[in-house]
């Protein structure tokens, strides 16, 4: 007798893959269908993990809980599949006005943001496109 499928997941992009992985780890029988469509969002999305976003440089919703869980999940998946899926990256954000510089400065002083900010960053190592930039925010981020 065939076991009944507990979950049917349509699409095996980043979200579908992680959801199916988590459900399988919990003992559920999962079926994933995917048409391999080249215009699927996972082929277009950069998979960027940016903990500080928006004009006011606020922490992304639930980021303190989500990043550690994401890293644990990807590391577990990497271990099982012998691949590399989560990559830590530096995010450079150009500060184009005094307002933006002031907002960023307030984040530098806020301890709740410190684990996501790189303060002493050698900007001379940045790409030549940033050579005329007077001020920038350096954020610890990642990508999938």
Regions found by a protein language model. Give the residues of each.
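Dinucleotide-binding Rossmann-like beta1-alpha1 core, especially the glycine-rich loop
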Residues: 48-127
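Hydrophobic anchor at the start of a short beta-strand
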Residues: 7, 30-31, 115
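Helical element adjacent to the flavin cofactor pocket in flavoenzyme catalytic cores
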Residues: 135-144
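Short, flexible turn/loop "capping" segments at secondary-structure junctions
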Residues: 42-43, 85-86, 129-133
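Glycine-rich FAD pyrophosphate-binding loop
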Residues: 24-43
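Short beta-strand/turn micro-motifs composed of small residues
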Residues: 11, 34, 95
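Beta1/beta-strand and adjacent pyrophosphate-binding region of the FAD-binding site
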Residues: 2-15
């Amino acid at each position: 007798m065939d076991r009944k499928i507990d979950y049917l997941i349509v699409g095996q992009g980043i979200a579908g893959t992680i959801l199916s992985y988590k459900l399988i780890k919990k003992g559920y029988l999962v079926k994933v269908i995917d048409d391999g469509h080249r215009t699927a969002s996972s082929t277009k999305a950069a998979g960027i993990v940016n903990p500080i976003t928006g004009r006011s440089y606020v922490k992304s919703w639930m980021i303190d809980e989500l990043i550690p869980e994401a890293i644990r999940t990807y590391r577990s998946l990497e271990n099982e599949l012998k691949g590399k899926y989560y990559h830590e990256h530096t995010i450079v954000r150009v500060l184009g006005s005094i307002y933006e510089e002031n907002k960023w400065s307030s984040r530098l002083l806020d301890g709740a943001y410190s684990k996501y900010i790189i303060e002493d960053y050698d900007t001379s190592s940045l790409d030549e496109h940033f050579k005329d930039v007077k001020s920038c925010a350096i954020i610890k981020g990642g990508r999938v």
